Amino acid sequence: MRADFFLSDNRAALLKRGLTIILSFLVFTSIFLLPSPSLAEDVKGADDPIVVAGNIKVKPDKKEEFIALSQTFIEPSRSEPGCISYSFYEDETEDNSFLFFEVWRNRAALDYHFQTPYFHEFVEKSPDLLAKPAEIKIYKIAETQTL
């Protein structure tokens, strides 16, 4: 009878520990991985456009996998409140090279994008597909003029 008592205590402790881990994960995810409501409000702030230009060289045998991964986050990114433009191109002049060209309303909009789950998924999965580190530059538009 004593062994059964310890088993039930161990099960209860394991269950409690498991629930603690799950709840901790959910709290962490909601705080750090999901865009915060206050950040979403900042996106509506003043226009101060930010341009992101990325050049990505992919391993030849990973090209199709990279395209599929990229396509999973293009539409959600375009739907974000601060996204002005989001383009993904295959470079016609260099094999296995891709270009991203993004325009965001302001830095808060880009920061919001960086916190989305699909962006985190891309950052997590893409390194194994790349032939070399991605070349990504962020530009702040100082002035625009009509031609």
From Swiss-Prot:
Residues 50-138 form the ABM domain. It comes from the Bacteria. GO terms for molecular function: catalytic activity. InterPro entries: ABM_dom, AI-2_Isomerase_LsrG, Dimeric_a/b-barrel. Pfam families: ABM. Belongs to the LsrG family. PANTHER family: ABM DOMAIN-CONTAINING PROTEIN, QUINOL MONOOXYGENASE YGIN-RELATED. This is Uncharacterized protein sll1783. The lineage of its organism: Bacteria, Bacillati, Cyanobacteriota, Cyanophyceae, Synechococcales.
